[in-house]
Amino acid sequence: MELSFASRKLAKELADEKTIVRNYGTDNGRRICLRLAQLTAADDLETLRLLPQTRAHELTGDRAGQISVDVKHPYRLLLVPAHDEIPRKPDGGLDWARVTKLKILGIVDTH
């Protein structure tokens, strides 16, 4: 998949493994690197959703439209589809199989 970042600061924080580990610690840093590699290698968001360890799911409430992917409890990688027109199913839900571009919003504790 094609990845972009919500800010230049975030892009710098997630630029390489050494920087990620320095910013987020060894355990979280390695897990973040793994998730970024999985996102890059996946053809679409549905592929990532099939990996049970990611616990990828859509959020609701004030974070509606965002997608959460587990990093290491309690942290989550927050994403949004980066398409000009967000792929939707006929029922209005997100069509995970057609999402091929994602914007990373950040790594946060959503709880």
Predicted regions and their residues:
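Arg/Lys-rich, positively charged N-terminal/basic patches that mediate binding to nucleic acids
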Residues: 1-37
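Charge-dense, helix-prone N-terminal extensions
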Residues: 6-12, 23-27, 54, 97-111
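A short, surface-exposed loop/turn module that caps and links secondary-structure elements
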Residues: 44-65
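Enriched for short, Lys/Arg-rich terminal
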Residues: 69-111
